[in-house]
Amino acid sequence: MNRNLLKQIWNERRSNAFLWMELFVVFVILWYIVDVVYVTLSIYNLPMGFDIENTYVLRFERMTSKAAAYQPGRTMKEDVADLHEIVNRLAHRPDVEAVSLSQNCIPYNDGANSFSFYLDTVPVRSLKRWITPEYFNVFRYRNIDGSGSESLAEALTPSGMVLSVNIADVYQDAPWHGKELLGRRVPVWRNEPEAEHLSIAALTEPVRYDHFTAPDDYGSRYAAVYLTDEALESLGET
């Protein structure tokens, strides 16, 4: 019986070869699908680095002459002062934990700002979080030293920026990485003595752009820069 079975297999070796080839192709395709699904789910379930539970977004624009409450002659300084008044009133409500201003950098935002600075001669490029200090408390960012979001809010100043700890990891030629960045004073935009310089005042855990962005992707590396009144005024004029 075994001899007849082996003989039959040998006689049908050509058709069996095609069958094995088909099975191999199906196996490769299934393996690829499983691998893609596994990697996608693994990335999806990684820590986001922020928390949006019970957060709300308010968007403001300047009134045009077509608005019923439009007041001609108002200056940008007055509009920015009114914006701060809205923020202060919201922040003093007992059911509100924190309120911040930001420009084009809330979680899951469709757009983003870019930023660059130099570590010695190495240009480092990342996303830009253009924010006021309370932003860290609103979205509960985490300081790498374990001190929480309050310390990050205190660290962000017009002369001091806050970075994600992994911001320079993809730049192998950079002289400093990770915790070594803390306290460095670096030129931004241009590597020249007269360029604006900012201090690296604090580092946060990696913050992902969305659920499908890995922690080492461009969208998960950022620099948080103080959103000044002057910047708000210039944004309102554009």
Regions found by a protein language model. Name each.
Residues 2-10, 86:
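A short amphipathic helical element positioned immediately N-terminal to and/or at the very start
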Residues 11-12, 238:
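Membrane-helix entry/capping segments
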Residues 3, 18, 51-53, 129:
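Membrane-embedded glycan transfer/ligation machinery
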Residues 37-123:
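Membrane-proximal extracellular/periplasmic loop immediately following the first transmembrane helix
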Residues 104-238:
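Mid-to-C-terminal secondary-structure elements
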Residues 8, 89-90, 135, 180:
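Alpha-helical scaffold elements within enzyme catalytic domains, especially in hydrolases
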Residues 12-42, 50:
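Short, strongly hydrophobic transmembrane alpha-helices
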